[in-house]
């Protein structure tokens, strides 16, 4: 068995024993790609092997699954937090929500907000959570993005009762399009795009709308074969004089010949977002459809489409978009930064992508609490990143090992220094302690060392007091005891003999005054005490008098916040 297959099998076993003996292919793929990001471009190829692995594990008795796995994974704790406001029209046990991301990019904080709100209301009232990939734009969708979304949601701790794709229902969506044409509530338009836009601005009816019914049905058939992309679209027969521009005969179907990542070239006529989301929400049994405020004007069209088709209409609710100042969520902004080499990838800690925030050390629990604290307001504001940091600080403080980090290190030789120091790993005392061999020579922070003078005193944190005997190029001192009441200036330190050199990446907002800030990623090179090597990769650390960081590797940490 290959390493990849072995890892996938372990993830599948963990998923199975956590869900009554039944593993899910999507969850296994998400877990594998989360652990091995380099495999994302091969997500499509991996699915076949994962399907076989999952089928085999699901055929095993649960006792055998547990036996092979060994230790059963601990279930994630539900995060506590403020409650969202009551949900209008909610019936206990019958709330159905959906999160419908388009697999055309990596998920970000805005996706997290939508997903969490949908999940929280089902948790509050009971019901069904649906994950539905809104994948009806074949040229933009990629298997890599389907996988990235699932990885992000899994990291957030969100699980779904139903997972599907809008493209699963293409035959139904096309039949509903034909139904609208047959009832006269839609028509086929062959106008050029510029002419369509001009008529909509002028509130002038399209000449195509006046054609005979049989012409529209013939045009619909030609859209599936003879017409080329851009030569024809199917439009909703709305109201060209409406003050709501969305209702001025919007496009419902268009021709696109790009291969779809799941369906290949099976279809060339694809529904617009407005057509697809309305039909899907209705047939999926959604009771409350949440979407961001930017879609508010489209609610009238949403209801009109379902009304013409005599289909059930869910309640639609809006919330404001979530963005941070200087931290773009738009693909139109992020992609050029990556393509131009200004930002290496979507997991850059300067970005508000889920991968970027994970790398920075922001926790899923902090994101959830932050989102809930914002409520359902529709007022568009740029949220302060500091507010998220405050929630994160509460999340990570209790399990962040305290360590010393010395930037721009200056050596000092100290006579009479105790050979070892025992320091608590956390002020609470709940995380044990560590011993450091001092060796008689230490590194001090260069900035602090600049202010030292002969005859002065400093207190080495957790070690004792030192008199400065030489403050020139070569620092030297003498240990004078451990009198904390003396009130000497405190300094962190690391032993010269066992100190480890690391880089600390310091992310800042990448956009300043509308332009990319080339200085937005700072680097601090310093020396850290040897216990750093014992901390697991991905764990949170608080470097004393510096801030919280996430350990990326034995040689690098990422600054989270102060």
Curated annotation (Swiss-Prot):
Record-level GO cellular component terms: cytosol; protein-containing complex
InterPro entries: aa-tRNA-synth_I_CS, Gln/Glu-tRNA_Ligase, Glu-tRNA-synth_arc/euk, Glu/Gln-tRNA-synth, Glu/Gln-tRNA-synth_Ib_cat-dom, Glu/Gln-tRNA-synth_Ib_codon-bd, Rbsml_bL25/Gln-tRNA_synth_N, Ribosomal_bL25/Gln-tRNA_synth
Gene3D superfamilies per record: 2.40.240.100, HUPs, Ribosomal Protein L25, Chain P
Main location: cytoplasm
Family from the record: Belongs to the class-I aminoacyl-tRNA synthetase family. Glutamate--tRNA ligase type 2 subfamily.
PANTHER family: GLUTAMATE--TRNA LIGASE, GLUTAMINE-TRNA LIGASE
Name of this protein: Glutamate--tRNA ligase
